[in-house]
Amino acid sequence: MATIGFIGVGLAIGLAALGSGLGQGIASRGALEGMARQPEASGDIRTTLLLALAFMEALTLFSFVIAILMWTKL
């Protein structure tokens, strides 16, 4: 039964990392396209991008903590 739990922990962190990586890539692509189109707004775009990337990374870290908590309960 513990094997299923380890698979669940692996899936939890793996899917969180996958989702976060895809989201960060899409957000970065959009920000770079926006900076290329409007260079005068690059400061505002960069600030917004960094804030969004921090939130996305925080969700990944939260899922890592949850995965560790799940692992210790096995």
From Swiss-Prot:
Keyword Transmembrane: yes
Matches recorded under CDD domains: ATP-synt_Fo_c
Keywords: ATP synthesis, Cell membrane, CF(0), Hydrogen ion transport, Ion transport, Lipid-binding, Membrane, Transmembrane, Transmembrane helix, Transport
Listed SUPFAM superfamilies: F1F0 ATP synthase subunit C (SSF81333)
Superkingdom of source: Bacteria
Ranges annotated as spanning the membrane: 2-22, 49-69
Molecular function in Gene Ontology: lipid binding; proton-transporting ATP synthase activity, rotational mechanism
InterPro entries with a match to the protein in the record: ATP_synth_csu_bac/chlpt, ATP_synth_F0_csu, ATP_synth_F0_csu_DDCD_BS, ATP_synth_F0_csu_sf, ATPase_proteolipid_c-like_dom, F/V-ATP_Csub_sf
Family in the record: Belongs to the ATPase C chain family.
Free-text function comment from the UniProt entry: F(1)F(0) ATP synthase produces ATP from ADP in the presence of a proton or sodium gradient. F-type ATPases consist of two structural domains, F(1) containing the extramembraneous catalytic core and F(0) containing the membrane proton channel, linked together by a central stalk and a peripheral stalk. During catalysis, ATP synthesis in the catalytic domain of F(1) is coupled via a rotary mechanism of the central stalk subunits to proton translocation. Key component of the F(0) channel; it plays a direct role in translocation across the membrane. A homomeric c-ring of between 10-14 subunits forms the central stalk rotor element with the F(1) delta and epsilon subunits.
Subunit (UniProt): F-type ATPases have 2 components, F(1) - the catalytic core - and F(0) - the membrane proton channel. F(1) has five subunits: alpha(3), beta(3), gamma(1), delta(1), epsilon(1). F(0) has three main subunits: a(1), b(2) and c(10-14). The alpha and beta chains form an alternating ring which encloses part of the gamma chain. F(1) is attached to F(0) by a central stalk formed by the gamma and epsilon chains, while a peripheral stalk is formed by the delta and b chains.
NCBIfam families named among the record's database cross-references: ATP_synt_c (TIGR01260)
Protein name stated in the entry: ATP synthase subunit c
Source organism per UniProt: Moorella thermoacetica (strain ATCC 39073 / JCM 9320)
High-level lineage: Bacteria, Bacillati, Bacillota, Clostridia, Moorellales
